[in-house]
């Protein structure tokens, strides 16, 4: 099946040329290209057109979950008849295993897996293995190790009507595929009822598989509603994929156990003069081996991943990228931020594991349960398009001149030319600008501060003046950041103050003023690239205005002014030539079910009275249901609050006994 693009508008401005050049580059085997597109020029629409033109399996890589979810929603709308999937880390909460030698403190791994995201991850791998019309939007989670595609596909169960499947062997196979027997219809489960077996695939929530038998002969396969089991479609055959990426064929498991034991013996010899570490590594690893023998799984099994893939020490881990065919298209969105993030992942992982291995908590093979290094990731960059308004030196060099500019905005709105005002007295001046915007135009304001503390203080100061304001920085969790952005667009707040508001991939047409405090403090967040990105946040509004509060013109400010003037003039010339009058962007407030906070959701609150045993048990059930619903809708922060409230109730319950 081919990609079928659905869009209510046709390419315009720079888009037709950008689409044609990028598509030709992919077809002509150009390894790296850059789409240098200004904010609001329709880069996502351009990429969607390229995907439809070249018709290749595609991975879109974003640098955070918020942006990934926005892109996922947009591509689903562009390709409603194709497999658009979502692949991010499935942890609502994750505390990695660690050992702090100076205090002799071992921290056990603690996590909470989001069931809905786990389903979407499995759906993504299933789609890319079955269909070429697959587009997966992913965070950098795609460079972390998961089970090998060879093991995953070898454990898939192919079912055909008319063939014999001894029931005891079939159910045993389902258990090996990480499906559990359960009378309740739930994901990754199966149930037997007389001559019928119902299977609830790990990667589906809308369909169940009903198998009917005559003795051991499979007589019918039906896709059914998972709750009512009303048939939807009868098929002659079906393929059921495993319930986990970490399934292990029996022959490979036996071989892996042998190599783990060999590594254990080597490590015990290494610790011969350190009895504590020797005893520790022996007991921990032996326990894991016994668990793998008995149930095919153990806690922390990913630390033995090299043994299950048969790879040599130091070899790259298998990851989502290995599930794609050789000719896949890679789109790296906001590449100026995503590429540095890929570089950073490996170093942080290795430093944490060093002490675990050194003190006998893990075998050295645990080092190979890791993300790809940047150099390893580059081997997958066979057909890549870097997308950014401010591409870095890496992308420019890699593309060897294959840079496609997309400066023209379909709306006709030119880049606002920044005004430079003194940093002395900047808060008072900004306050006047805010009041002017709110009293006359009811428009929104972004303020860029130099520190988190200043952002928090500024938000508090404005709130005291009865100006609805909030701050946004890295200390706020993903889902809460998303809610704050929604609040800004919907009018709950009018002013948003942050340190690095670039990282959100902000698409806020209501913002008409961007004010950058201390713009002359040269550095990472006041570089040319950052300043241009900040300016772009006001370029979606017809009344867009940018103010740099600076006592001197730094080199970054001067370069930003020159580049802004260049882009502005291109847009103005285009508008004049085509008689275009700038018009505002009318965009619905983002209603992605993955991120949207339900209006009827309940916030966990402290009880106003002592609770009885029955009250606490009822509260636990309520919070668990709310947690699961919030997690299913990707409201991560809310889910975590419900989890904490549920845990608090459980702890209170203990004191009643």
Curated annotation (Swiss-Prot):
A motif (Beta-hairpin) lies at residues 90-113. Residues 24-409 form the Helicase ATP-binding domain. ATP binds at residues 37-44. GO terms for molecular function: ATP binding; ATP hydrolysis activity; DNA binding; excinuclease ABC activity. It is found in: Cytoplasm. It comes from Chlamydia pneumoniae. The keyword DNA damage applies. SUPFAM superfamilies: C-terminal UvrC-binding domain of UvrB (SSF46600), P-loop containing nucleoside triphosphate hydrolases (SSF52540). Forms a heterotetramer with UvrA during the search for lesions. Interacts with UvrC in an incision complex. Residues 617-652 form the UVR domain. One of its GO terms (biological process) is SOS response. It comes from the Bacteria. Pfam families: Helicase_C, ResIII, UVR, UvrB, UvrB_inter. This is UvrABC system protein B. Residues 426-589 form the Helicase C-terminal domain. GO terms for cellular component: cytoplasm; excinuclease repair complex. The beta-hairpin motif is involved in DNA binding. Belongs to the UvrB family.
